[in-house]
Amino acid sequence: MAHVGGLWLHGCLALAVLVSLVHSQHVFMAPQQALSLLQRARRANSGFFEEMRKGNLERECVEEQCSREEAYEALESPSETDAFWAKYTACESVRKSREKLVECLEGNCAEGLGMNYRGNISVTRSGIECQLWRSRYPHKPEVNSTMYPGADLRENFCRNPDGSITGPWCYTTSPTVRREACSIPVCGQGRVTAELIPRSGGSTVNVSPPLETCVPERGRQYQGRLAVTSHGSPCLAWGSSQAKALSKDQDFNPAVPLVENFCRNPDGDQEGAWCYVAGQPGDFEYCDLDYCEEPVDEEVGDALGENADAAIEGRTTADDFQPFFNEKTFGAGEADCGLRPLFEKSSLEDKTEKELFESYIEGRIVEGSDAEIGLAPWQVMIFRKSPQELLCGASLISDRWVLTAAHCLLYPPWDKNFTENDLLVRIGKHSRTRYERNIEKISMLEKIYIHPRYNWRENLDRDIALLKLRKPITFSDYIHPVCLPDKETATKLLRAGYKGRVTGWGNLKETWTTSASEVQPSVLQVVNLPIVERLVCKASTRIRITDNMFCAGYKPDEGKRGDACEGDSGGPFVMKSPFNNRWYQMGIVSWGEGCDRDGKYGFYTHVFRLKKWMQKVIDRFGG
């Protein structure tokens, strides 16, 4: 056994070296060198028959040729028979040689088209990490384990379920590359199925940014001479008549000198330095500086110190609520936001909000439950006109504006690029499909505003969009806006272990079934989820996490479950402030790798981080 374990360790180390080399932008191996790393030492005993030996399988199917029925009689399991038969038929060309057949069945090398391959290589020929077969991000798979039950579509290992002529392949974690072949050693030959190739420009997926000198405090003290935006637009001089007109009534810090046309951050925008530019669409753009990462949740200690929990538990007076937006452009609703007509305004609690408060003083909806009517009066359904279908969730923030995720509207890997004329919003709904007469309101859209630095190509950074309604909506017991957090609220509540709430009409479980009734809820679902430590979030994925994101969900050892799932995207992650009894939207459902998978979490757009961008757009286009 020691000999076998040593060979196994040798194989793992060889694979680790290969992955390291493939991810380099400058080092690519010759085929013979790659093959020497990819080929795995033979074990003392046949691993395939150590795992699969049942009945007379070896005698029936290796020493002789067998039928599927004979294989089933030996294995006595439909799933194991499917898996064995897929490999056995893929190895048909080498059945006459026992040694070659066993090598082919073990699956550590490719025979023919490589449909027999069952190894654990999980990078493509150009060095991109493979997407999990069960995941829908960043690509929606057309090939899955239901279609090919014997293809062993586990984890993110390279496979060839559909008989691709290029050999084993996978969907990639790069949104710009849907699927790509892998470089797999061919059985008994000194070559691989696909030669290793460099990617032009290198892959940015899974690679952390280099350690360089960064700009602190999101550029609030930046005094550099950069005068061009990230889109290449020249900045207007701060003293120009156009810039002065746009700056009128803005809350600028007088300590920030607005010199010439250099990028500055006079309003403390969490997005960083910016400047005015000529003409449409927004008259302002952000500048491309390398900012130091400063997550809001790590600032909590400075704000509350060790007395944070005591401050919440011992609260005696309600915090004064200060409106943030200009009502002329934002519309009505902010002064009364987050106070639900059927609960807070009626002095009632919903069934699970106590769980949220207890998490404060203690430190896709899957596994959720039916929401009470009026529980989330800010919940919005984004509805596609043709074909008619639920597209995403969203939230009402005033009588004129709706907040959602940018990827609901623009995501080329899923062929999404919707305009105002493609969509409408349904507000006040409880039922997923039924039209709720005299309760729900349907509104057309006037304009869609997507964050200019939304990064769909890599990691959905700044996954946020604003929808302006064509006409103001009328509030009711079932339609009411949610609050958006200020810094004080964000620092008090966005703490690891504190629970927030996600609502939506998304799938109840992750599945490939074709029957919608099995996975789609009939009414709005709700689940309470704890915020997760930032380091744990980063360690749970190979995708680069930014400070415009946070993650939430239960850890494998916590004994509880829950997550957002397909269809919940764009919906709100809300928390109730124990200081003023208002509900605040802290996040937007953005992305996740599968639904409710152990060790994986849901990722949310950090609303407070992007609030200044929202203010600029609303001030400019809300009139």
UniProtKB/Swiss-Prot annotation:
It catalyses: Selective cleavage of Arg-|-Gly bonds in fibrinogen to form fibrin and release fibrinopeptides A and B. The modification 4-carboxyglutamate is found at E50, E51, E58, E60, E63, E64, E69, E70, E73, E76. One of its GO terms (cellular component) is collagen-containing extracellular matrix. GO terms for molecular function: calcium ion binding; serine-type endopeptidase activity. Residues 552-574 are annotated as: High affinity receptor-binding region which is also known as the TP508 peptide. Disulfide bonds join C61-C66, C91-C104, C109-C187, C130-C170, C158-C182, C214-C292, C235-C275, C263-C287, C337-C483, C392-C408, C537-C551, C565-C595. It comes from the Eukaryota. It is an enzyme of class 3 (hydrolase). Activity is promoted in the presence of negatively charged surfaces, such as polyphosphate and dextran sulfate. Inhibited by SERPINA5. Glycans are attached at N120, N144, N417. The record marks R199, S200, R315, T316, R364, I365 as: Cleavage. Residues 25-43 form a propeptide. Pfam families: Gla (PF00594), Kringle (PF00051), Thrombin_light (PF09396), Trypsin (PF00089). Belongs to the peptidase S1 family. Thrombin can itself cleave the N-terminal fragment (fragment 1) of the prothrombin, prior to its activation by factor Xa. Heterodimer (named alpha-thrombin) of a light and a heavy chain; disulfide-linked. Forms a heterodimer with SERPINA5. In plasma, interacts (via N-terminus) with alpha-1-microglobulin; this interaction does not prevent the activation of prothrombin to thrombin. This is Prothrombin.
